[in-house]
Amino acid sequence: MAAGTSNYWEDLRKQARQLENELDLKLVSFSKLCTSYSHSSARDGGRDRYSSDTTPLLNGSSQDRMFETMAIEIEQLLARLTGVNDKMAEYTHSAGVPSLNAALMHTLQRHRDILQDYTHEFHKTKANFMAIRERENLMGSVRKDIESYKSGSGVNNRRTELFLKEHDHLRNSDRLIEETISIAMATKENMTSQRGMLKSIHSKMNTLANRFPAVNSLIQRINLRKRRDSLILGGVIGICTILLLLYAFH
């Protein structure tokens, strides 16, 4: 019976690790999609990406479809990983083995932390993508209104020129903001990679500590002996100092 429950726990851990690996790859691709969308809108800043007839619209709709598809896939993976974590939580409560319960809870907490990080990263990247797309739609609408006004009136007066200059200035500022967002997202990907590496190192250290408890016990005894020797040495030095002072003032 114990072997069966142990195999069930290991199977859940295997499923969790597999889903976490899939989510990691999906989130990296999702972040790159958002970055490429930002770069494409920045490259089109010098010309109206909404005034052309077919190609930009097709590219935009293709990216939108890809975004929706990847978002659905990531949400499904997050839901599956949540289900596996819930099963692991049920197992820890019904294991009935106090000596193993702490180790199981520690493993479960690590998987929960990873799920929380992936969920936060997904929602943040999705929000950035939606903000960029809404901003592009707004700027394209303004540009179309300006072009419609120019073609309808046929008068290139001073007010229109000032309005266009202000619009171009806003687009340049928007391009700088998008470049800053891209740099921040690249930095975030690097930090995420380093965080995963540190978690892996921490997990290996915990595994070694749990596998070799005698090493921890030996280190604690050595530290205790050092502390005791320091106290004895300090006491001897204090007594000698007092005796010397008494002798000097005698």
Swiss-Prot record:
Q: Cellular component GO terms, alphabetically?
A: cis-Golgi network; cytosol; Golgi apparatus; Golgi medial cisterna; Golgi membrane; membrane; SNARE complex
Family according to the record: Belongs to the GOSR1 family.
The protein's job, in short, is: Involved in transport from the ER to the Golgi apparatus as well as in intra-Golgi transport. It belongs to a super-family of proteins called t-SNAREs or soluble NSF (N-ethylmaleimide-sensitive factor) attachment protein receptor. May play a protective role against hydrogen peroxide induced cytotoxicity under glutathione depleted conditions in neuronal cells by regulating the intracellular ROS levels via inhibition of p38 MAPK (MAPK11, MAPK12, MAPK13 and MAPK14). Participates in docking and fusion stage of ER to cis-Golgi transport.
Which Gene Ontology terms cover its molecular function? SNAP receptor activity
Bilayer-crossing regions: 230-250
Question: Which parts of the chain are coiled coil?
Answer: 9-30, 68-95
List the top taxonomic levels of the source.
Answer: Eukaryota, Metazoa, Chordata, Craniata, Vertebrata
Q: What is this protein called?
A: Golgi SNAP receptor complex member 1
